[in-house]
Amino acid sequence: MKTEFLSINDIFFLVKIGFKYVLALFNGFYLIKIVSYPNEHSIITNKMIYIGIGILLKIILIIIYWIYFMDIYILKKNCNKKFFGNIYCNSNKIIDNNISTTIIESDDFEYKKLIKKFFLKKMYYSLKKGHKIVKLYMLKIYNSDFNCYFCNTRDILYAIIWYISLYYWRRDEYNILWSFNKIPIYIYNILLILLSSSYIDLVMIIISYNKSKYHMMKSKLLIDVFFSSPSAFFFSRHFFVLENGIDIYFLMGFLRIIKVFLNVSYAKTEQSYILTNTEIKVIRIILGVLLLCNAFASTLYTIQGIHPYNIDNHDLYYILNNYLDYFYFSIISISTVGYGDIIPTNKLSRVICIFFIFWTFIWVPIQFNDLIISIFCKKETYGKLSMNNQKLILLIGDIQPEQLNTFFFESVAYGNKLKFHILTTYPINLYEEQIKIADNYCISIYIKNFDLNEKHNTNLLYSVNAQNAYYMFLFSNKFNNGHYNIDTKSFTRLLILAKFLHGEKKNAVIELRNKCVSNIVKSIGCEHFAIVNLKHSLIVKNLVCPGFITFLSNLFTAYNYNENPYYFNNSKYLHSFNFIAEFNKGSIAKIFSFAAHDNMIGLNFDKLFYKLYESLGILLIGIESSHINNNHFVYSNKKRLNFFFENVGRSMIKGNGIRDRTRKTGKIGGHKKFKFKLVYLCFLKRYIHSLSRDNCDNTQMITILNCKKNNSKMNKLNKKFYLKEIPNLLEMLNNHVHLTNKSNLSTPTWNNGIKESYKEKNIKSYHYIIDTNNINVAYKNNIPEKGKKDRGGIYIGNKHTNDTCARTNESHKNNRLRSRRSQNGKPYLGILKNCNNELFHTKKMNNYYESYRNNSNINEISIPNKRNGKPKCYLNLLGKNYFMKENDKCIVLANSKKVINYLSKAKSLFWLFEINSTKMDKVTYDLKSIIKTKQYFNKIPTSNLVKNIPIMPHMKNKSIISKHDSKIIPMDYYDLFNAYKSFRVFPQINYGITKNMLRVSYKENFNNDINNNRSIGDRSNSNSFSKLGMDKSTLSLTKFSNENSHMDSNSNDNYTVNYEHSDQAFFKGCVNWGGCNNGNTNIRENAQNEVYSINDVMNSVIKMEADKYTFEVNLNDTILVENDYNVLQKNNIKNFASIKKSNKNSNNNNKCEQIKQLNNNLTFKKNEKKTKSNKQNTNDTLERRKNGVAYSYLDACQKYFAHSAKNKKLLLLINYASNIIQLVKLINKTCKYNIIILTSEISSINIHHIYNVAFIKCKTMDDYSLLNAGLLQAEYILILPTEVNDINEINEIDMNNIILTRKITYLLKKKKKNYFINNIITELINPTNIIFLEENNMIKMTEKKSSYSDFFPYINSTQFYSSNIISETMLYNFMAHHKSFTKFPVSNSTLKCLIKDINIIYVCELRKYSDFSFKKIKTFRDLFFFLSKKCIIAIALYRKGDKYVPFYIYTKPCENCLIRFDDIVYVL
C-alpha cells in the first residue's frame, strides 16, 4: 500500500543527488580558498575577476554548442497536454477524437506518475525529473566532440604556460623545493582562467557520473581529478607546504605534458581527410615517442633539476642546456642503451625511470603491431565506426562503386555530413577510387567486407551500428540479372534485417531486379525499387516524349550545372555558349515536397499555386495526401433528358450537330428518340480513348435511373441524373462504359467501351452505368475551358476530371471485371459464349442495385471505399476546387535554396497569404484559335481526316497518324486548320459515316427475322441483335459507295477476300454502327478485280502479297469482335450481311437479294478454304516452333511484318539481353512498333507471334550489318549492353557501346539530311564512361577541381545534352534522392506518376502562318500563365540548340525566356 512517505530507495536517491551537488559546490569553495591565500603579487579581488572570466568563457562556449550543434529531446514546462495528445494521435493514425490518449514519454524521462494527494511524493518526482534533464544536458555536452577539442586546446595552452614558467624557477640544490616568487602576474592570471574553465568540466563529470562511467576510469580523467581544487589544496597545504596554494599547479605541471601525450595516443582519426590510415599510424608513433620522452624529461627536471639564484645573465641558455640533458637521458633510458653519463640522483628519480621504461615497453610495440597489420594484412574493413549521433546511412549487399558514387554525390550536393556504413560482398580494394572521393569531399565512410546472407548473424549488424541507422538500402547483384536467386538473396537479407530491428519501423529501401518478391516485400512494409522495370519505363517513355530521360534526371538530381571549361578551349564551341548557359540556368529547378504550413491550410489549390509562383517563383504541381476528400459533387437535372450526352458531345463535336438535327425531326419520343440515343452512345464510344489497365480505379460513376420506354413512344422525361464524386480525390477511373438491363440480361454483345443489352419487347426500364473515365480521356490532350456552360445553361459538372491526376497506390488486379479481360485488351472467347448476369452483378454492383431498390428517391449513391493510410500522389489539381488540409505535402519544382530559405521557416510565409497582392491586368491572348484547333483535332479521331496532312520538313521521316497510339506528333498547323474547317461538316453526316465506307457484318437467323417482319435496316423496329462475331477463317468484305444509289442485282462481280487461317491466330474485325445514304448500294470493282478501300476514314484495308488483305483496327475506334468458327457453325451462323440504315421508303426485297449474293460467295470461298487448310495448318505449326529470324530488313518485312500496318514505325534494338522480352512487352503495350533485334545470339523463346519481333543475326556490328538491319528506316535505335559476368568487364562493354553509338551517329549524318541525335538511346553500365562520347576528341579531365564535373560527370557533361543515355546507376538518384539526403523528401508514388502519366503538347512553326499570332505570348512565363488559366501546368521546354548542343531541357518558367516556335512544351 502506497503511503505519502518516501521509501528507502527514494531517500537514497535524494542523498546521492545532494552529495553530487554538494561535491560540486565543495570544489568551487576550495578553488576560492586556494586563491585567497596571502600573495604579495595580487589581491583577492583581481583573482576572483579572472576566475569569473574563465567560468563565463566556458558557459558561452556551452551555449554556442547548445544552440547550433546539440540535438536532444527537450521537455518544455509550459507544453500543452492537448498538443502532445494530437501528436500521438497523428503518429498512430487515430481518428476518434474522443479516445483518451496517454502521453508516451522518452526513455530518458520515464518516471512514475505524480500522485497529487501526496505532497512529498510530488516534490520528490519533480526534483527527480529536473535532475534527469540536467544530467542529460551535462552528459551530452561533456561527451561531445566540441568539448573534446576545447579540452585538448586548453591542455596544450597549459603545457605552454608551464614551459614558459620554467625560466623563473629557482633553487640551489635538488633536495629543496623550487621557489616561484619570480613568476610574473600575467602567468598567474592565465592559469586562473584555465583552472576556472576546468572546474566546469569537473562539475559536469560529477553530476553525470552514472552515465559517464566509461569515462571515469580513463587516465586523462584521473589527471583532471588530481588537479581539482580540493586535491590541490590538500597537497599544497599538507604534503608540499607551499606558501601560495596555486603554486602546486606549477610544481605538478609535468602531468599536463603526460595528458597531452595521452590525447595524441588515443585521438580519433576517422575524420582525417589529408593522410591515409597508415600515414596516421606512423605519425602517431613518432609524435607519441617524442611526447613520452618530453614527459619523462619534464618529470626528472622537476625532481632533480637545479637553477641557482646567481645565474641571471644567461638564464635562458642555462635552462635549455639543463633540460636538453634530461631529454637525452630519457631517450637513452627508453632505448635501453644506458651510457651512464647521466644517472638518477635519488630514489624518487629511479622510480620515475622504472615507470616510464615499462610504459614505453608496453605502448610502442602495440603501435608498431597495428602499423604492420594495416600495411601487410588483407583489408576486411576500412575506416572507423561512427559512435556519435551523426546521421548514419547503411548500405548492404552487392553495392557497386558507381552506385556508391551516386550516394556520395547526393550527400555532398545537399551539404549533409553523412556517415556511410557499407556492408558489401566485394573486396575493399575495389572501392579505392571511392575512398579517394570520400577523402576529397570530407565524407566519412566505414566499409566491411562481409555477406549478411552467409551466416545469418544479426551480431554483424550490431557491429556496424545498424540500430542507429537513419536510412538503410539493400542492393542486388546486377550480373546475371536474369536469374531468380539474385532477388532471393536480397530478400533473405531483408528478413535478417527485419528480425534484427524487432519490428521497429526504420526507413529501408530494397532494390529488386524483377517483381517476383515485390508483393512480399510490400507486405513487410519496406519500400522497394524494381530497378530494371524503372529503366524500361524510362526508355519507353522517351520513345513517346523526346528528352524525357534528361528532364527527369534534372528534376531528381541535385546537380548544379556550370559551364565546363573544356567547351571553350576551342573557338568552335563559343557560339554554343548561349545554349549551354540557358540550359544551366533552366536546370536549377528540382523537385521537392514540404509539409503544408498552417497559413496554407484551407487555401484553394489554385490560389496557393499562383501565390507561390508569383512571389517566390516556386511551381506547385501537386500534393501528397492521405486524406479522404469530403467534397461531394452531386448534380441532378429533372428537365433535360440528354444531360450527359449533350455535355459529352459538346466536348467532342463543336455545335452538337447531332442533337440539333434530332430536334429538327420533331420526333423526340418513341422509337426515334431511343434509336438516336443508342446510336449516339455507340458513336461516342468510337471516339473515346480508354486508359491503360494499369490506371484503373472504380471511383466515379454516372448513374441514369428510371428510363422508361414503350414500344412506340417514350414517357415523360422523368429521369434523374446523378454525378457523384466519391471520397478519394480525382482518382483514375475504370475504362468501361456499361449499359446493362436492370432485369435479366439477354444476348449481350461485348464492346471495347460499352455493354449493350436489349430485351425482345416491352422494355420498361434501363439501368445505365457509364464510366466517366472514357470522357476523362477525351479531354486528356485538350485544353479545357474552366467554368464553361453548355447552351442550355447547365454547368458541366464533370469538368473537374479534365486534367491528368494520377494515383498509383491501388492495383487494377482488385477489379473483378477487369480481371476477366485478357492482357492485350481483347475479350476472351468464353466471355462471348457465357456472358450472363454474374459478369456485372458483382458484390460492388449489387450494392448499387440494392441502394436503388431500397430508395426510389435517392439523390446520391455512396460507393464504399477503404481508407488507405499511405500517401497518394495527385498531380495538377488546377480547377479541382481542392482545399489544402492538415498534413498535406506540397510537391513543387523550385530551387533548393528557395525551398530551404522560405518554406522551411514557420513565419516566412505570413506576408504571402495575409497581404493581398495586386492583381495583374487581364490580357487577351491570340492563342485561343490554336487551343480550339487543338481541342477539336484531338476530339475527332485523326483517322477520319480525308486528306493527308503534311508535316514539318524535319519530321518527314515520321508518320503523322498512329492508329494504335493516341499521341500526336508535331504537325503543320496551317494544313491542320484547313482540314479542321472542312471537317466542320462532319457532325451533319449520319453518325460519322462518310462517302466510301467498308461495311462488314452478319445477321443471325435472318430468315426468322424476315418471317417476323423485322427489317434489318430499320433499327427502330429491331431490338434483337443476338451476337456479333467474325469467322477466323473466312471473311466477306463488301464495298459500299454513296455515289450511285443503285445496286445491280444481276451482277456477279461480288468479290470476297480470303483471310486464311494460317495467316494469323485470330481475326480482328470492325463493325461500325451507322448507315449509308438512302437507296441501294453498288459494289465497286477496281482494275485488278480487288476490293479495298480508298481514303477509308474508319478502317484500312491494306493490300498485301498473294491477294491477301487484313484489317488494321484502331482499338479505340472500333468494336472488337472475335469468335470461334465452330461456335458460329453450331448456331447456324453462315450469313454475312451489311447493316445499313435506310429511310421509310426503302425496299426490303433489295436487301434480301444483296444478302443472297453475299451468301453464295461465302459458300464458294468456304469450300475453297477447306482444300488449303490442312497444308497451311501443318506449315503454320512448324513455323511457330521457330523464332522470327531474317537476313535483312526487307526480308523481315516480307516474312514477318507483311500483315502489320504500313505506317508502323521501326524500332532497332542492338544486342540481346536476358530481360529484353520485358522491354519489348512494355514497348508494344505503349506504342506499336515493328521491332528488329540485331544480335549475335538468337533467343530460344519464340516472341515473334506475340510481340511482332524479328531477329537478324550478325557476328560484328560493322556498317553493312547496321544498314542491312534497317538503320536508316528505324525511328529509334536502342543500344543495350551485353551480358556482364564480371565487374571488370563493365568498362570494356561500355566502350564497345560508345564506339557503336559514334558509328551510328556518323552513318545517320552521312545518309540522312534530317538527323535527330535524340533518336539514339544508349544504355551504359558505368555512367562515368559517357565522358568519352565527345564527337571530335576525347575529354581530358581538368586538373583544377571544378564543382562536381569530375566527380559525377555522367549527366549532360558532354555535347549530348539531351541525347538518350540511360544507366542503371543513374536510376539510383531516385533511390537516394529525397530519401535521406534532404529535409523535403518526395514519396515513391510521385516518381511513378511522373514516369507513367505525363503528357506533352507540341508547339511547332507557328510564326509562318497568319491564322495564329504570338503577339501577346512571347515568353515562357506568358505561355505558362495562359495555359494555367486552362487548368494546364507547363513544367518544361524541350528545345533545339545547334550542332554541338543539339537538344536540351529548360525547366524554369518563372524566367522571361523567349519561346521559339519549334519548342516542345511539357505539361501536366
Curated annotation (Swiss-Prot):
GO cellular component: membrane
Cellular compartments annotated: Membrane
Topology in the lipid bilayer: Multi-pass membrane protein
Membrane in keyword set: yes
Listed GO MF terms: potassium channel activity
Intramembrane stretch boundaries: 326-344
Disulfide bond entries: none
Major place of residence: membrane
Transmembrane segment boundaries: 48-68, 146-165, 185-209, 221-240, 246-264, 285-306, 351-368
Region ranges (Disordered): 804-823
Function comment: May be involved in transmembrane potassium transport at the subcellular level not affecting bulk potassium transport across the plasma membrane.
Name of the protein in its database record: Potassium channel K2
Organism: Plasmodium berghei (strain Anka)
Organism taxonomic ancestry: Eukaryota, Sar, Alveolata, Apicomplexa, Aconoidasida
